[in-house]
Amino acid sequence: MTATDLVAALRPVVEAFDSLGVQYFLGGSVASSAHGVARASLDADVVADLDASKVDRLARQLAGAYYVPVEQMHTAAVDRRSFNLIHLATMFKIDVFVSKGRPFDRSAADRARRHAIGELGDGAFFVASAEDTVLAKLEWFRLGGETSERQWWDIVGLLRVGADTDRPYLRHWAETLGVNDLLDRAWIDAGHQI
C-alpha cells in the first residue's frame, strides 16, 4: 500500500468528518510513521468523536466509494466502539474508533496536529501526538495481554526517536490509564533512564 493510496482512502473520510463537524485524528501505525517510526500497514486507525445523529449523513457521503456498514456504524456510535470502512478503489481498510469521551481521549484530540502524509506531502491530516500515540499503544498492549511485539516495538521506537518527548504528560496519563509500569519498561527498552 502506497502513501498515495492511503491519502486517497483517507481524504474523503476526513472531509466528511470535517463537513459534519466531527473531531478526528489518526492513530496507530500511521501516527507512528508520522513521528519517525515507519511501519507498513494495510489499514489506518482513525479516532472520531462521532455522534449517532451524524451516522446516516456520514454514510450517505461515503456511499459508493466505500463499503459502509450503516448498522455497525450506529452501534459503534452508541456504544463507543469501532467499525470498519473499506475504500473500494484501493481496498484500503479504515478502522474508525469512536472516542470514548474520557479525559485522556479529549486531551489526545486537542493535542492532535496536522501532518503531511507521503513523500510529496500529499494530504495534511490531524495525527495524534507522539505521546498520545505511545499512551494509546500502551493501553492496547495491556488489553491484548502484553503479547504484541509489533505494538511494543512501536512504543519503544517512538520513545527512542522522541528527543522532545513531554515526560510529565506521559507520566500523568500513564498513571491515570494504569500503564505506568509498562511505560517504565518501555523507557528502559528504549535506552533511557526512568
Where are the model-predicted features located?
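Compositionally biased terminal segments of proteins
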Residues: M1-I194
